[in-house]
Amino acid sequence: MSEPIRVLVTGAAGQIAYSLLYSIGNGSVFGKDQPIILVLLDITPMMGVLDGVLMELQDCALPLLKDVIATDKEDVAFKDLDVAILVGSMPRREGMERKDLLKANVKIFKSQGAALDKYAKKSVKVIVVGNPANTNCLTASKSAPSIPKENFSCLTRLDHNRAKAQIALKLGVTANDVKNVIIWGNHSSTQYPDVNHAKVKLQGKEVGVYEALKDDSWLKGEFVTTVQQRGAAVIKARKLSSAMSAAKAICDHVRDIWFGTPEGEFVSMGVISDGNSYGVPDDLLYSFPVVIKNKTWKFVEGLPINDFSREKMDLTAKELTEEKESAFEFLSSA
């Protein structure tokens, strides 16, 4: 057995965490021979609920779970971390302006970034899930200057999986038969799900998705909007936001960071845009296609970008630039 790793989940009393914690504890993310110390952070009013989650994790009697720590204190939560999964954020309330939401979250992620900087290992991998995820991730990274910015990523894997699922449903195959879809940009309704480079396995042969579907207007229209608005559709139907699918996407994202991406496959994650070859401005936290090896991601380079894609990629970059500018205003005054 190897040494235990310390894994933090914030927003640990919430519903995404409730769907996530068992998978982390049972070895589905870090492997079946990796012991784990699981640290659960939430705000003080949620500590009663968090105690219940702690009891349940104990009652799962998971062999890999060496210890579970529930806390509302950042200095306890962020100490010596190997992995931080930042799920907790201020949710958008009815009638709340996006600006107010951004301001509340800048405060949270500035504080958590500073705690990472002060207490966590410098090699910590930080995954931001709480919305607005891209800008929250950038805020945390800027507030943790001693941790390499490449160690920060935000979740767009849920959008990636949603795109795969839509293509699979349309073609009557399983999602596993679809690979190399891309989510470009922000985890918002301006994201651009791109299948120009995606492949699907049909009768044992790999075929381009455009070629397989022969329905360009669906791919450029309804497919894009369905993926962009899927989160809202789930809320409308379930009266709660996606939790099971979000937790599964977090597991996929973190497992790929830990073990690498399969040969010939790439995935989508929000990462720092510095040095990309796709004309996205530097210093944005933008979702790109990446491959991962030895716990290090690299951009997938050299994919041809058509005019339709270019326009969509620029639009979401513009939104991220505006979000970043507002956040940085709050950051300097926070």
UniProtKB/Swiss-Prot annotation:
Single GO biological process annotation from the record: malate metabolic process
Positions where Phosphoserine occurs in the chain: S217, S241, S309, S332, S333
Binding site for NAD(+): G11, A12, A13, G14, Q15, I16, A17, D42, N105, Q112, V129, G130, N131
N6-succinyllysine modifications at: K110, K214, K298, K318
GO molecular function, one term: L-malate dehydrogenase (NAD+) activity
Keywords: Acetylation, Cytoplasm, Disease variant, Epilepsy, Methylation, NAD, Oxidoreductase, Phosphoprotein, Tricarboxylic acid cycle, Ubl conjugation
Chain positions with N-acetylserine modification: S2
EC number in record: 1.1.1.37, 1.1.1.96
PROSITE patterns noted in UniProt: MDH
UniProt cross-references to Pfam families, sorted A to Z: Ldh_1_C, Ldh_1_N
GO CC list: centrosome; cytoplasm; cytosol; extracellular exosome; extracellular space
Post-translational note: ISGylated. Acetylation at Lys-118 dramatically enhances enzymatic activity and promotes adipogenic differentiation.
Coiled coil segments of this chain: none
InterPro entries associated with the record: L-lactate/malate_DH (IPR001557), Lactate/malate_DH_C (IPR022383), Lactate/malate_DH_N (IPR001236), Lactate_DH/Glyco_Ohase_4_C (IPR015955), Malate_DH_AS (IPR001252), Malate_DH_NAD-dep_euk (IPR011274), Malate_DH_type2 (IPR010945), NAD(P)-bd_dom_sf (IPR036291)
Positions annotated as active site in the UniProt record: H187
UniProt superkingdom: Eukaryota
In-chain residues carrying the UniProt-annotated modification N6-acetyllysine: K118, K121, K298
Subcellular localization(s) per the UniProt record: Cytoplasm, Cytosol
Disease: Developmental and epileptic encephalopathy 88: A form of epileptic encephalopathy, a heterogeneous group of early-onset epilepsies characterized by refractory seizures, neurodevelopmental impairment, and poor prognosis. Development is normal prior to seizure onset, after which cognitive and motor delays become apparent. DEE88 is an autosomal recessive severe form characterized by global developmental delay, epilepsy, and progressive microcephaly.
Subunit (UniProt): Homodimer.
Family to which this protein belongs: Belongs to the LDH/MDH superfamily. MDH type 2 family.
Official protein name in the record: Malate dehydrogenase, cytoplasmic
Organism: Homo sapiens (Human)
